[in-house]
Amino acid sequence: MARITVEDCLEQIPNRFQLVLAATYRARMLSQGHAPKVDCKNKPAVTALREIAAGKIGLEMLKKVPL
């Protein structure tokens, strides 16, 4: 499987800071048992980035973060 890069994800979420926040929150969700939206047998952080690069996850992740 090809390596995932930040540039692949920046096409979906152009702001690097928002990208990191969305990927972090999604990785936490995956580690707590949520189902991945892409076929991936990697760690939660890599899976979250793959989901973002595939367009399955976007900025809506930031709206789900509890304050």
From Swiss-Prot:
Keyword line: DNA-directed RNA polymerase, Nucleotidyltransferase, Transcription, Transferase
Gene3D superfamilies per the UniProt record, alphabetical: 3.90.940.10
Enzyme class label: transferase
BP GO terms, sorted: DNA-templated transcription
SUPFAM superfamilies, per the entry: RPB6/omega subunit-like (SSF63562)
Subunit structure: The RNAP catalytic core consists of 2 alpha, 1 beta, 1 beta' and 1 omega subunit. When a sigma factor is associated with the core the holoenzyme is formed, which can initiate transcription.
Name of the protein in question: DNA-directed RNA polymerase subunit omega
Native organism: Albidiferax ferrireducens (strain ATCC BAA-621 / DSM 15236 / T118)
